[in-house]
Design a protein with these regions (language model features):
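Extreme N-terminal leader/targeting segments of oxidoreductases
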Residues: 1-24, 42-43
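N-terminal Rossmann-like FAD-binding beta1-loop-alpha1 element of flavoenzymes
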Residues: 22-49
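Glycine-rich FAD pyrophosphate-binding loop
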Residues: 42-62
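Active-site substrate-recognition segment that forms the wall
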Residues: 63-66, 71, 75-115, 243-252, ...
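Dinucleotide-binding Rossmann-like beta1-alpha1 core, especially the glycine-rich loop
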Residues: 65-189
Length: 434
């Protein structure tokens, strides 16, 4: 780590406009933008990465860090709609919207209700499954290319239940996963205690996913991606992009730090902040900030060996190099309201229910964080070209699966830009699908 991280990242020099080859700009230096920038470099482009924050320090920073390839359903399904009133009214539940934001959120929720009907939800599941199937292989290629394969761990993960009456729920999950060729198995309380001896003895059963992977730490991975990008001649501009202006179909002008810079091609990968830039090029999308919270505890307080997801509490516990991280909440709340402190208290309470040993020390220290998942009502990202200006492309809106799908999204986007055959049909991910 650097004493002053930005001093190590900031490069306000602008790309040489007369250099040979394609001048390719990537707006957004989260994990998706970093993967796109590296993939564009690999394909011979001269790449400039632009963000007003340090690479990997915004939404990507606080992720749980595991590749959630078994999460194949969109956030909205008929089952979720049936459970929504109970989830919404539960003061310790995972779904919430700040009162001050409800009026603004209504249009998004209306589209969410439509997307959660049986037929569109099933289409969403099929699309997410295709992306997730390809996710681990893409990450393996990406990290091997930068000599950082050790940052990806095949550690397996557990979905756990406390309620003994919910064994059928576990078996239904196993049956569904097997239909999609996702390996998993039932785990009783005795074996669960062997796999994770520090978890609460109140846990009844679990489903174990032996083939799942996790990253050592999301920020550590972003740093490795950025370091490789820089070592290969990539330029980073630490500034805000104020405007995007396609000039016919020959180039794209970006307004950066009161200067207009011209690029041959531009990829918008700015997460939830992509929305306002799209409006500058005539596209309106129902993209919202789905705020997520985490609390990170020190390693020595308690240890788990696998990523643990609580089916009852809707919480993820993730063992990272940065510490033991508890991640949760799905809060449609925009980007301007402050974090709601109650969410951190709820996360700690849920964590204590799963891992009581962690709280043996009354002076336990921890860090808190809140970030903005870019979320569409149908839970699918955009991976597409502008319908009128093909030199302008998009990869954003991955909701809970930004870390999972970042590397495969980069490969798919560059294939589309270069008009190569796609491994996965991308029609469902069009920018104008709404």
């Amino acid at each position: 780590m650097y004493d002053n991280p930005l001093s190590a990242f900031t490069n306000t020099s602008l790309p040489h406009q007369g250099s040979a080859g394609i001048q390719f700009a990537v707006v957004g230096a989260g994990v998706v933008g970093l993967c796109v920038a590296l993939e564009a470099q690999r394909r011979g482009h001269h790449v400039t990465l632009i963000d007003h924050t340090e690479p990997g320090k915004a939404t990507s920073y606080g992720n749980a860090g595991y590749l959630a390839t078994e999460i194949i359903d969109p956030l909205g399904t008929p089952d979720v709609l049936r459970a929504a009133p109970k989830l919404w009214l539960n003061p310790k539940g995972p779904i919430c919207t700040p009162w001050r934001y409800i009026a603004k959120a209504i249009p998004w929720y209306w589209r969410f209700l439509n997307a959660a009907q049986a037929e569109p939800a099933q289409r969403g599941t099929d699309m997410i499954h295709q992306l997730n199937q390809a996710a681990v292989g893409a990450w393996q290629r990406t990290l091997a290319d930068i000599n950082a394969s050790a940052l990806l761990i095949k550690g397996g993960h557990l979905v756990v239940w406390e309620n003994t009456q919910k064994r059928d729920e576990a078996h239904q999950l196993i049956e569904k996963m097997h239909r999609y060729d996702i390996p998993c198995e039932f785990v009783d309380a005795e074996r669960l205690a062997q796999l994770e001896p520090e978890l609460s003895l109140s846990l009844s059963h679990a489903v174990f996913f032996p083939e799942s992977h996790r990253l050592t730490d999301p920020y550590e991975v972003c740093r490795a991606l950025f370091d490789a990008f820089s070592a290969r001649g990539g330029v980073f501009i630490n500034a805000k992009v104020d405007d995007v202006h396609p000039s016919s179909n020959t180039h794209i002008d970006l307004r950066i730090a009161a200067q207009t810079q011209r690029f041959d091609k531009v990829a918008l990968c700015a997460g939830v902040w992509s929305k306002q830039l799209l409006e500058r090029v005539g596209i309106t999308v129902p993209l919202e900030a789905e705020r997520g919270y985490h609390v990170t505890f020190p390693h020595d307080a308690a240890r788990i060996h696998h990523t643990v997801l609580s089916a009852d509490r809707k919480l993820v516990l993730s063992p990272l190099n940065a510490g033991l991280r508890a991640v949760g909440m799905s809060e449609i709340g925009g980007t301007t309201l402050p974090a709601i402190k109650k969410r951190y208290r709820v996360l700690r309470e849920h964590t204590k229910g799963l891992l009581p040993k962690l709280f043996d020390n009354p002076q336990l220290e921890s860090t808190e964080w809140m970030g903005y998942r870019p979320s569409f009502p149908d839970s699918l990202p955009v991976i597409d070209l502008h319908p009128m200006y093909s030199r302008l492309s998009f990869a954003f809106g991955h909701q809970h699966l930004g870390i999972t799908q970042a590397a495969i999204s980069a490969e798919l986007l560059l294939d589309k830009i270069e008009q190569r055959p796609s491994l996965i049909p991308l029609d469902a991910l069009r920018v104008d699908r709404f």
